[in-house]
UniProtKB/Swiss-Prot annotation:
Residues 70-82 have a biased composition (Pro residues). This is SH3 and cysteine-rich domain-containing protein 2. GO terms for cellular component: cytoplasmic side of plasma membrane; cytosol; sarcolemma. It comes from Homo sapiens (Human). CDD domains: C1_Stac2, SH3_Stac2_C. It comes from the Eukaryota. Keywords: Cell membrane, Cytoplasm, Membrane, Metal-binding, Phosphoprotein, Repeat, SH3 domain, Zinc, Zinc-finger.
């Protein structure tokens, strides 16, 4: 500062002794120095602290350098970028994240209802009431199979349709997961349940697995017998269950022998139970307990497999039942083949019954107790004793009646 004051005083002294022509030049130099100092103060005060430190080191100069160097004109403010310059990428000290374009929204899939005649009792999705009637009962969605009344379709038609569910899961449910395992406990189950996109367990799967496990537990603990859905109500009233778990027809006499051909493969080699002594009947009861609730069925119709895990059926095939936890699709075994088949395609063959094939068509009067049969139709004889007039009582599916013995051939 002393140097600056001395330098500023020197022109004053010189101005007193200098001629008038040089006075104006000295005043200009003083004015330039004054403007130079003011420009530095203006820069330091006007610039904010953030902008001041963002400037490069080459642009910053010490105050002594600013005072000692000749004045430099201030750079003009940068003009706004033109349209041609906007296309060029200019680096910025703090770049802002460029927003990504939004993904195209998928169209919402709505229900596609069509008229449907419901053969079974189906509740409405909206009012939860049963859909009843003979014709034009209600509507059902093509994709998700949701059932609604005609008057309830307007409110639910605007809702989103979840789409078609997996065919194998809907048909077979969770039966394949529980076949070769003991009855599982739902709380300690180690199965890997199917999870959705959000990682949550499917509630339908949990409900089905819980019901299946309860059915297996009840069957193993109480030895409950499984019956074919094709049996009529009157036929169930005539059947009684003995202590060993086998079922006999009440129409048979107490002296009639029950042939164990269709109960288990190991029992077909031995004679009837009436020929055995009481001491020899103990192994049979043990064998019956080991086999469990596996019964013999006969195929009534031909079934072609629709999936890899289906079991092909031919009329007259003998099937050993493995799992009947599902109402519509059962799991059975024919020789070395194991798979699923429709439950209404087979009929239960109980001890004492024979399987017959119709060798010639027969037309009978239903009101008189006769049953009509087509050629090669499979039926099961209810009793072993033939009627006096040459007729035998048989059943095929839900039909039941008398058929002449000449029209049947035992399989």
């Amino acid at each position: 500062m002393t140097e600056m004051s001395e330098k500023e005083n020197e022109p004053d002294d010189a101005a007193t002794h200098s001629p008038p022509g040089t006075v104006s030049a000295l005043q200009e130099t003083k004015l330039q120095r004054f403007k130079r100092s003011l420009s530095l103060k203006t820069i330091l005060r006007s610039k904010s602290l953030e902008n001041f430190f963002l400037r490069s080191g080459s642009e910053l100069k010490c105050p002594t350098e600013v005072l000692l160097t000749p004045p430099t004109p201030l750079p003009p403010p940068s003009p706004p970028p033109t349209a041609s310059d906007r296309g060029l990428a200019t680096p910025s000290p703090s770049p802002c994240p460029v927003p990504r374009p939004l993904a195209a929204l998928k169209p919402v899939r709505l229900h596609s209802f069509q008229e449907h005649v419901f053969k079974r009792a189906s509740p409405c999705e909206l009012c939860h009431q049963l859909i009843v009637g003979n014709s034009k009962q209600g509507l059902r969605c093509k994709m998700c199979k949701v059932s609604v009344h005609l008057w309830c379709s307007e409110e639910i038609s605007h809702q989103q349709c979840p789409g078609k569910t997996s065919t194998s899961f809907r048909r077979n449910f969770s039966s394949p997961l529980l076949v070769h395992e003991p009855p599982p406990v739902c709380a300690t189950s180690k199965e890997s349940p199917p999870t959705g996109d959000s990682g949550k367990v499917d509630p339908v799967y949990e409900t089905l697995r819980y019901g299946t496990s309860l059915a297996l537990m009840n069957r193993s603990s109480f030895s409950s017998t499984s019956e074919s859905p094709t049996r009529s109500l009157s036929e169930r009233d005539e059947l009684t269950e003995d202590g060993e778990g086998s079922i006999r027809s009440s129409e048979e006499g107490p002296g009639d022998s029950a042939s164990p051909v269709f109960t288990a493969p190991a029992e077909s080699e031995g004679p009837g139970p009436e020929e055995k002594s009481p001491g020899q009947q103990l192994p049979k009861a043990t064998l019956r307990k080991d086999v469990g609730p596996m019964y013999s069925y006969v195929a009534l119709y031909k079934f072609l497999p629709q999936e890899n895990n289906d079991l092909a059926l031919q009329p007259g095939d003998r099937i050993m039942l493995v799992d009947d936890s599902n109402e519509d699709w059962w799991k059975g075994k024919i020789g070395d083949r194991v798979g699923f088949f429709p439950a209404n395609f087979v009929q239960r063959v109980r001890p004492g019954e024979n399987v017959w094939r119709c060798c010639q068509p027969f037309s009978g009067n239903k009101e008189q107790g006769y049953m009509s049969l087509k050629e090669n139709q499979i039926c099961v004889g209810v009793g072993r004793s033939k009627d006096a007039d040459g007729f035998i009582r048989v059943s095929s599916g839900k039909k039941r009646g008398l058929v002449p013995v000449d029209a049947l051939t035992e399989i």
